[in-house]
């Protein structure tokens, strides 16, 4: 997503990823007489080597090494955008939801899960109601790391816990949405934000299949404006510059989009 605009603007990029045939590396050549670094984007040594070559270090996805990015920034090796604090927040979906909730951003009902026991899950299900979605706090992406719980039977609870593995979890109340909506928001270092028009995202098997623009919401006038306003407000509370994808559910009344 960075390489095409960078090529059009004549901005040289160094891309850190494992292998020489990753999509970004195939799309944009490294600056003259150099090559893209080869290695995992969670590796401290590779990140530090990349930082020495760059004026600004940014990320395409949040599943990176935030600790190293903080060190790179504090040591002055290069500028890091968005702020490592923002990346760390986005990495933990529960902390992200709590952060937005505390700042008045509408989110789905949620509860943290401490001990992953049958009794603990039952209490949370009683509070949020069934069905309830059990979610991994970290390394979750595009439906991965989610397990819907339809009942509080021992077998169903254990099946969900086994599926989600050893990662920390939280629970989210069920949202009977009618559309999934996304807004791209641009934020600069001074905190100014601008957004693009909202789009509808259609998923199948937890994978985005179709993205429709402009957003079509028959009988729900003003949804685009409300979605953009909500997305800009959410991103306005973050730190650092970047382009952020804000996903939300559109509820049946058309009046209450909530951040995912």
Each language-model region and where it sits:
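ATP-binding N-terminal substructure of ATP-dependent carboxylate-amine bond-forming enzymes
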Residues: 1-98, 116-119
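Short glycine-rich anion-binding loops that position phosphate/pyrophosphate groups of nucleotides
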Residues: 62-64, 137-139, 186
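Internal nucleotide-binding/catalytic subdomain
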Residues: 149-254
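A short beta-strand motif that forms the metal-chelation/ATP-contact edge
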Residues: 255-260
């Amino acid at each position: 997503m960075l390489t095409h605009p960078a090529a059009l603007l004549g901005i040289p990029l160094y891309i850190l990823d494992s292998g020489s045939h990753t999509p970004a590396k195939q799309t944009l050549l490294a600056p003259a007489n150099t090559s893209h670094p080869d290695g995992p984007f969670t590796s401290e040594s590779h990140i530090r080597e990349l930082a020495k070559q760059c004026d600004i270090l940014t990320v395409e996805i949040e599943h990176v090494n935030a600790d190293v990015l903080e060190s790179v920034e504090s040591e002055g090796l290069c500028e890091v955008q968005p702020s490592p604090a923002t990346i760390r927040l986005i990495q933990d979906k529960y902390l992200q939801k709590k952060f937005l909730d505390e700042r008045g951003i509408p989110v789905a009902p949620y509860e943290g899960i401490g001990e992953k026991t049958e009794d603990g899950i039952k209490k949370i299900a009683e509070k949020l109601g069934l069905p309830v979605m059990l979610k991994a706090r970290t390394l979750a992406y595009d439906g991965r790391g989610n397990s819907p719980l339809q009942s509080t039977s021992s077998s169903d609870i254990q099946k969900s816990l086994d599926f989600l593995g050893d990662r920390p979890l939280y629970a989210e109340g069920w949202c009977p949405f009618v559309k999934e909506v996304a807004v791209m928001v641009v934020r600069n270092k001074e905190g100014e934000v601008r957004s693009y028009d909202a789009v509808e995202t259609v998923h199948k098997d937890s994978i985005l299949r179709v993205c429709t623009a402009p957003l079509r919401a028959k009988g729900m006038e003003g949804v685009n404006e409300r979605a953009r306003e909500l997305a800009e407000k959410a991103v306005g509370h973050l730190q650092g510059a970047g382009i952020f994808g804000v996903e939300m559910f559109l509820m049946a009344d058309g009046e209450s989009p909530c951040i995912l």
